[in-house]
């Protein structure tokens, strides 16, 4: 929403909050879609640079389903690509998806980008992704969306297991 409105106040407010809390780094990951990069590349570059200057990580969301262009990966200073769930779903049974994921991981590694898999729902999907170098995964296999209070309880239990 900030991106679409070209609202610069978010950067000032975020910087102020980080200073007030004495954070040494910004614990926020910002996600932009591929279409954001296409719609207004100058604005996208400015937004990415401003968030990066605050220490936020910038992720390219739903990678591979929009206007994918490898040139975007080289042009925009992002930190991670989020592999869309269409590649993840039943990947252990889909040879084409397996090949595409391996290729995407290879490109990301060559560009020093992190890869995050979205939509992981089964242990078999998780095993394939882990085996192929994707160390961050999201999806119902790990937790479903939940209210903040429920998340706090879940997180405390998670820390006890870790």
Regions found by a protein language model. Name each.
Residues 2-3:
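Short, small-residue-biased leader/transition segments that mark boundaries at the very start
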Residues 6-7, 39:
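Switch/connector loops and helix/strand junctions flanking conserved nucleotide-binding motifs
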Residues 10-16, 43-46, 95-102:
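Charged helix-capping and loop-helix junction motifs
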Residues 15-91, 107, 111-145:
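The catalytic core of metal-dependent phosphodiesterases that act on cyclic dinucleotides
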Residues 78, 96-97, 156, 160:
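Residue-level marker of structural boundaries
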Residues 130, 146-162:
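C-terminal helical cap(s) of enzyme catalytic domains, especially alpha/beta-barrels
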